[in-house]
């Protein structure tokens, strides 16, 4: 009888250890497979799944999924590195509550398809409308403005940015002032007057999952704040 009881205790302890320690590892492997099935590709990808208590994972609920990877591509988003945490996840319905983290070396597409470099993107908020704070160099945006002006209008110009959102466009030695503005998720160069047309620098849609809502020009960096639907991106 005593031997039987000891065996039951040992069996219970084994099951407990499997549920408490091994279950998150197993679910992590399944989550990695689901991530890859969604179109995610990356190098050295690590997915850590946790729930409190761990047996809650058997119901399909995870408190947190932490994803790190490099050389990432997923749908229209490309990044040199990703460090993102998903919270309050229903793995059965693939619904995500909130998102937080950082993307570095991000590339999106300009309206003409050319790549646009974003140094860093910080994510925070609801998975369906995550606030994305993007940091770009002023030099990158000036080059982007010049290339899009040339592509969209045929006008060769020099573009200089100045805080908080001012622009000077010089064509054949003549300068025209303007502003960087946002409208319907796009970043626009809007010249004052009617001499030059409005030029779209970044627009949501093919090649760009971000919707821009505000822009601020600093001394060396430009900050874009907008939203991204991480839920759609990962499912």
Task: List each model region and its residues.
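N-terminal beta-strand/beta-hairpin edge segment
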Residues: 40-143
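Short glycine-rich, low-complexity/disordered patches
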Residues: 45-48, 154-165
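Short secondary-structure junctions
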Residues: 37-45, 149-154, 205-210
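Solvent-exposed coil/turn segments that connect beta secondary-structure elements
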Residues: 52, 70-72, 87-89, 106, ...
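Extracytoplasmic/luminal low-complexity segments enriched in Pro/Gly and acidic/polar residues
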Residues: 186-235
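Small-residue helix/turn framework positions
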Residues: 95-150, 163-165, 170-205
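Hydrophobic membrane-targeting and insertion signals
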Residues: 1-61, 66-76, 219, 225, ...
């Amino acid at each position: 009888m005593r031997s039987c009881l000891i065996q039951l205790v040992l069996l219970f302890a084994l099951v407990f250890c499997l549920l408490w320690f091994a279950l998150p590892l197993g679910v992590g492997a399944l989550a990695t497979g689901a991530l890859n099935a969604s179109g995610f590709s990356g190098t050295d990808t690590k997915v850590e799944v946790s729930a409190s208590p761990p047996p809650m994972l058997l119901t399909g609920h995870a408190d947190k999924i932490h994803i790190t990877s490099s050389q990432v591509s997923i749908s229209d988003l490309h990044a040199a590195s990703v460090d993102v945490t998903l919270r309050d996840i229903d793995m059965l319905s693939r619904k995500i509550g909130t998102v937080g983290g950082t993307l570095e070396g991000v590339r999106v597409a300009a309206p003409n398809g050319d790549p646009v470099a974003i140094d860093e993107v910080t994510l925070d908020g609801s998975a369906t409308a995550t606030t994305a704070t993007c940091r770009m160099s002023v030099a990158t945006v000036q080059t982007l403005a010049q290339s899009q002006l040339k592509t969209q209008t045929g006008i060769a110009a020099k573009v200089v940015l100045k805080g908080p959102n001012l622009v000077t466009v010089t064509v054949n030695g003549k300068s025209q002032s303007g502003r960087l503005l946002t409208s319907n998720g796009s970043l626009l160069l809007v010249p004052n007057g009617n001499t030059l047309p409005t030029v779209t620098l970044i627009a949501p849609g093919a090649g760009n999952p971000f919707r821009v809502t505000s822009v601020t020009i600093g001394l060396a960096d430009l900050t874009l704040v907008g939203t991204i639907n991480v839920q759609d991106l990962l499912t």
